[in-house]
């Protein structure tokens, strides 16, 4: 009995340490991957202009690294440089870029700017659920409940099982 108790505790400790080391190694892997992607896009942007997909990907990497200013700059560069913004195949990316800019400004507590970018995303893609939910949240924050409810209704018409719209709609009633 006395011998099995320390073995049991050591086994539990070993399992805990193995799990903990696995989690840390996954985090390190994510950090190194993010850093290599950032460096790749940084080098590529120095050598030539980034296309719309690369610019969007670079902006996402900048957000993940909490380089919000750089993400804003890169997003605006992509939107400004690209003359193919009106093509339908780029509409989804452009809507995501506008939504991403809205998200950055929302996190910086610049709700008016965020609202403008969410509206632009919806202009590009009227059924973009994420931007619709984000704009509705802005209206909630500014106590414009009727507009928020209308946007949540639109989301629920597109996707009836949308958890965000269902939850917020119940909350604002």
From Swiss-Prot:
GO terms for cellular component: chloroplast. Its main location: plastid. Keywords: Chloroplast, Plastid, Repeat, TPR repeat. It is found in: Plastid, Chloroplast. TPR repeats lie at residues 52-89, 95-128, 129-162. It holds the Pfam family TPR_8. The keyword Repeat applies. The keyword Membrane does not apply. PROSITE patterns: TPR (PS50005), TPR_REGION (PS50293). Belongs to the ycf37 family. This is Uncharacterized protein ycf37. It comes from Porphyra purpurea (Red seaweed). The gene is ycf37.
